């Protein structure tokens, strides 16, 4: 059975306007440059990590090893995923767009709907991918282990016990994360606190003042809750990265260079194929096909703070 389709459009003599869909969550962790991308991982890629103990010692006349180098590795293995949809062209015959389909018995899928469909499916995949990056679980259909699953399984990660975050406690909780950041990382250019939209909203509200958390009645620049205009956020000198796929009350403090996303070909994430079945089996179906690989991995666990 072909996938059920539902079209909402308007018609006034000629086709007017574009299809309107609900705003889609973009894969902002990728598009915003929040993690390191490995775009050409054919099957798997080994990420080498190394650690040195005390590297300087008192001088002597002899050569003596001053440090021990410990090598380790993490394996980034993208998971194969796919999208398969089938649409019946007859579903469009009674639509106001029938004029654009041509008058042949073998109607062609309207070009503007095809464009919309490609964008819609790609955006849906991007939204799911954003969630997978942070909260995915490999055991679930269409998912791979996200960062939170990997961090929870790594004993070397710096764990911070979390709670339900509100505007009243968000500053204290962010403070716990910053306090747990290793001294060697604080101040690094690519260090971020990755947080959910929920936490970012609570932080913005707290900085709006009105007595919240003792900040006074007027908030930032005496603008109250109107102070925020969508710009970058920071806390105690550490930049905040709002990751829409992050679990509601979770935070991760890490360097971008220590978080990796791997895929076979980067372009696969924005490629959807439409296959008209009329010439193949005589049906009125159009198939939408998308295949890609995706996965994430962390580098050095001891350099990551996980609040949960």
List each language-model region with its residue ranges.
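Short coil/turn segments at secondary-structure boundaries
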Residues: 97, 133-138, 188-196, 216-220
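Alpha-helical scaffold segments that mediate packing/assembly in large oligomeric complexes
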Residues: 98-180, 307-308
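Ordered core of a single globular domain
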Residues: 172-210, 219
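Long, hydrophobic/aromatic-enriched structural stretches that serve as scaffold segments
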Residues: 56-115
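Intrinsically disordered or highly flexible coil/loop and linker segments, enriched in small
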Residues: 25, 126-135, 187, 212
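Short helix/loop capping segments that flank catalytic or ligand/cofactor-binding pockets
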Residues: 95-96, 130, 202-204
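Sequence/fold signature of self-assembling virion shell proteins
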Residues: 2-57, 145-168, 204-308
């Amino acid at each position: 059975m072909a996938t059920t389709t539902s079209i909402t459009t308007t018609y006034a003599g000629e086709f007017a306007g574009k299809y309107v869909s609900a705003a889609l969550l973009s894969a902002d962790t990728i598009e915003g440059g929040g993690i390191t991308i490995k775009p050409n991982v054919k099957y798997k890629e080994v990420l080498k990590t190394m650690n040195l103990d005390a590297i300087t010692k008192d001088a002597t006349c002899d050569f003596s090893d001053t440090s021990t180098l410990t090598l380790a590795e993490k394996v980034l293995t993208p998971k194969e995923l796919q999208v398969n949809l089938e649409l019946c062209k007859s579903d469009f015959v009674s639509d106001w767009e029938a004029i654009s389909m041509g008058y042949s018995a073998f109607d062609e899928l309207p070009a503007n709907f095809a464009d919309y469909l490609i964008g819609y499916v790609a955006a849906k995949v991007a939204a799911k991918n954003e969630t997978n990056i942070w909260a995915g679980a490999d055991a679930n259909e269409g998912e791979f282990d996200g960062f939170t699953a990997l961090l929870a399984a790594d004993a070397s990660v710096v764990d911070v016990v979390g709670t339900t975050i509100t505007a009243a406690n968000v500053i204290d909780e962010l403070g716990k994360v910053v306090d747990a950041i290793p001294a060697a990382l604080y101040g690094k250019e690519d260090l971020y606190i990755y947080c959910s939209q929920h936490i970012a909203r609570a932080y913005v509200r707290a900085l709006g003042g009105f007595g919240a958390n003792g900040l006074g009645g007027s908030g930032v620049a005496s603008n109250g809750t109107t102070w925020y205009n969508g710009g970058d956020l920071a806390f105690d000198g550490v930049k905040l990265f709002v990751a829409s796929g992050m679990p509601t009350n979770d935070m991760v403090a890490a360097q971008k260079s220590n978080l990796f996303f791997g895929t076979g070909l980067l372009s696969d994430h924005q490629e959807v194929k439409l296959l008209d079945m009329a010439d193949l089996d005589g049906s009125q179906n159009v198939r939408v096909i998308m295949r890609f690989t995706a996965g994430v991995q962390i580098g050095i666990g001891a350099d990551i703070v996980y609040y949960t």
